[in-house]
């Protein structure tokens, strides 16, 4: 129910979590936000704000995200006047977004994509790497020959291959392999998607 994507950059890999918009998946949306410091509100220029968007914004505001960026997509499907009206509507209806960074983009024409990528690449990392390791598991499955695999987001700390960890039940487990941001790794860090 959660979508994941990664953007490799020169010095780091950005991870994206696409949370479901439908209200019946609200619990999944909340699970996807664990360990996340920045949010992007994605609004299609030709569709505007959906009912679920209002609910998600209320949650993001309550969770006190460091920053909520507004990305208006599909700019090629709307006039400049429609885009400006949408931006004004967002700022009027959600005053806490008035000072947010706004990006007008189009995947078809490439408009605004480089500016958004550059902005994201320069955001400060806020991961709590120097704290004890905490990991929110969102999926568990078995792989023949590998054993139990868990996926989730690291909230704090770091983990390495052969580390021994404790589950919330008190059961001790050992880390055999790590995939960080969908890539094999020796170590996983706070803020990363890990398996």
Per-range role (PLM):
Residues 28, 52-59, 85-93, 115-120:
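Alpha-helical scaffold elements adjacent to nucleotide-binding pockets in ATP/GTP-utilizing enzyme cores
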Residues 12-14, 19-24, 34-57, 61-84:
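Conserved Switch II/interswitch segment of TRAFAC-class P-loop GTPases
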Residues 32, 63, 93-97:
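Alpha-helix C-cap/termination motif
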Residues 75, 92-195:
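Conserved catalytic-core segments of large NTP-driven translation/proteostasis enzymes
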Residues 3, 28-30:
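Conserved alpha-helical scaffold flanking the Walker A/P-loop in AAA+ ATPase domains
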Residues 1-10:
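Switch I (effector-binding) loop of TRAFAC-class P-loop GTPase G-domains
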């Amino acid at each position: 129910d959660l979508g994941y994507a990664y953007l490799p950059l020169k010095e780091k890999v950005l991870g994206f979590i696409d949370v479901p918009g439908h209200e019946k998946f609200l619990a999944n949306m909340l699970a996807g936000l664990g360990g996340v410091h920045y949010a992007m509100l994605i609004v299609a220029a030709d569709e505007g704000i959906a009912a679920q968007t209002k609910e998600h914004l209320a949650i993001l505001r309550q969770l006190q995200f460091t920053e909520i960026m507004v990305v208006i997509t599909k700019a090629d499907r709307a006039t400049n006047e429609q885009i400006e009206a949408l931006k004004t509507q967002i700022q009027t209806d959600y005053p806490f977004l008035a000072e947010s960074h706004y990006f007008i983009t189009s995947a078809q024409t490439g408009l605004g994509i480089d500016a958004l990528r550059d902005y994201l690449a320069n955001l400060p990392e806020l991961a709590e790497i120097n704290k004890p390791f905490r990991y929110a598991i969102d999926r568990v499955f078995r792989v023949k020959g590998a054993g139990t695999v868990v996926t989730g987001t690291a909230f704090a700390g770091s983990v390495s291959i052969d580390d021994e960890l404790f589950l919330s039940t008190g059961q001790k487990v050992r880390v055999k392999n790590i995939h960080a941001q969908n890539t094999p790794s020796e170590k996983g860090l706070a803020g990363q998607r890990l398996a």
